[in-house]
Amino acid sequence: MGVYAITGGSGGIGLRVISQLEKQGHETINIDWKTGDIQADLSIPEGRQKVIDELHELHPEGLDGLILCAGVPGSCHDLRLILSLNFFGTISIIKGAYDLLEKKGGSCVATVSNAISQGDLRMDLADILNNNNEDELRILDLVSNLDENDLLTGNRLYVASKYALARWVRRHSAS
């Protein structure tokens, strides 16, 4: 059976993904900041690097899949966290685990992005995220002057982060 790493596996969608994979006989690695097999804060570069290092130590032979479910809602009242976890954390883990996925040949990556409704989409921010995804600090500075207690702003940033993630995945996936 396969080896799958799942972010956000201690609750919500991630927990259900782990449950289904384990029922099918697969080995799972729960990556979560609370109670994971690998405990790390994916909203900061040090936490992301910890995950990448531990995945390489645990499974140098490779991964069959990487399923990225970790995220926070627009109502979390921390605009920087929305972007750093939902977008930057996810793409950093994909990039850092890419060589492990390549080793297995038929590996897959799945991201959770439920930004179907794009009525309040900050397309400008989605474009900035996609075109400058190597400059996290500068992008986080752009949102630091916005009102964290404004639910509409939080939701717009959430949708932009998830839409940008979906676009990033499409740009980097095999055709």
PLM features: residue spans?
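N-terminal Rossmann NAD(P)H-binding glycine-rich loop of SDR-like oxidoreductase domains
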Residues: T7-S19
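Rossmann-fold cofactor-recognition segment
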Residues: W33-G47, L68
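Conserved Rossmann-fold cofactor-binding substructure of NAD(P)-dependent oxidoreductases
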Residues: L42-E61
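Rossmann-fold scaffold of SDR-type NAD(P)-dependent oxidoreductases
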Residues: T7, E61-G71, G105-S113
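A hydrophobic alpha-helix adjacent to the NAD(P)-binding/active-site core of NAD(P)-dependent oxidoreductases
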Residues: D37, I82-L83
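Hydrophobic positions on the long internal alpha-helix
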Residues: I93-L101, W168-V169
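Catalytic loop of short-chain dehydrogenase/reductase
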Residues: G74-C76, G106-S175
